[in-house]
Design a protein with these regions (language model features):
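Nucleotide/phosphate-binding catalytic cleft detector across ATP-hydrolyzing
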Residues: 1-73, 81-183
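Conserved Rossmann-like nucleotide-cofactor binding loop
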Residues: 76
């Protein structure tokens, strides 16, 4: 879909495509990804492990002899890896990602403030004022959110802050942290 969307109907050239995949996929799954990418219109397809791609994106010197831990929180899973000398030394993953964080925020706001918000608002809170650590009053960020009052059913606006997000996602973040410690 993405290749067709990018190139349109007129194909002057076929692109070479780099596909990021989880570090732990099998060789059969790797072949399937390459074949599907070529079938979608790519001239060639290359595989890069997601933690390596994340490390490159974060300007981590992956070729050095020093070990670097990368935690890549995706939509559905979080992948942790130790990278050294350009490769993955050790990796693991857990089925906790951004989507679960959004749902945790949504539930927290509903339970604590009796305000029903949507997933888009929860994600916006995570992106704009989110923090994995509790912040002091001088450091925390705030934003206004709109939702539906859980009692009256009427629209309501309220201000939330970084510590609301931290409290909401603390359980999920603990799961990610405990998994990372296993490497």
């Amino acid at each position: 879909y993405f290749i067709n969307k990018t190139l349109g109907k007129v194909r002057i050239f076929r692109p070479e495509v780099m596909v990021a995949v989880p570090a732990g996929i099998s060789s059969t799954e790797r072949r399937a990804v390459i074949e599907a990418t070529i079938a979608a219109g790519a001239k060639a397809a290359y595989i890069i492990k997601e933690p390596v791609a994340a490390a490159i994106g974060a300007n981590i010197p992956i070729s050095s002899a020093t070990g670097h831990m990368v935690v890549d929180i995706g939509g559905g899973t979080s992948e942790m890896a130790v990278i050294s000398l350009g490769g993955v030394v050790s990796s693991t993953s857990v089925r906790v990602g951004g989507n679960k964080l959004d749902l945790a925020i949504l539930e927290y706001i509903r339970k604590k403030y009796n305000l029903v918000i949507g997933e888009r608002t929860a994600e916006e809170m995570k992106m704009k004022v989110g923090s994995a650590l509790f912040l002091d009053d001088d450091s925390k960020l705030t934003m206004e959110i709109n939702g539906r009052d859980g009692v009256s059913g009427l629209p309501r606006t309220m201000e939330v802050n970084s510590n609301d997000v931290t409290a909401a996602i603390s359980g999920e973040m603990e799961t990610i942290l405990n998994t990372a410690k296993k490497i």
